[in-house]
Amino acid sequence: MALENPKMHNSESSKRLGAEWKLLSEAEKRPFIDEAKRLRAMRMKEYPDYKYRP
């Protein structure tokens, strides 16, 4: 989407992607959810003492 619309603001991109995400079925979302879980586990293993502190 960013390549197709290089001048689009990040907030607008996020809104559009969020709307598209809501239209996906659970089966279509599953690969992305599984990948996020895998990456989270990998980061936790690499950085076990990391704590998010805004």
UniProtKB/Swiss-Prot annotation:
DNA-binding residue intervals: 1-54
Database matches in SUPFAM superfamilies: HMG-box
Pfam family, one: HMG_box
Matching PROSITE patterns: HMG_BOX_2 (PS50118)
Entry keywords, A to Z: DNA-binding, Nucleus
GO terms of molecular function: DNA binding
Subcellular location: Nucleus
InterPro entries for the chain: HMG_box_dom, HMG_box_dom_sf, SRY-related_HMG-box_TF-like
GO cellular component: nucleus
Name of the protein in question: SRY-related protein CH7
Species of origin: Gallus gallus
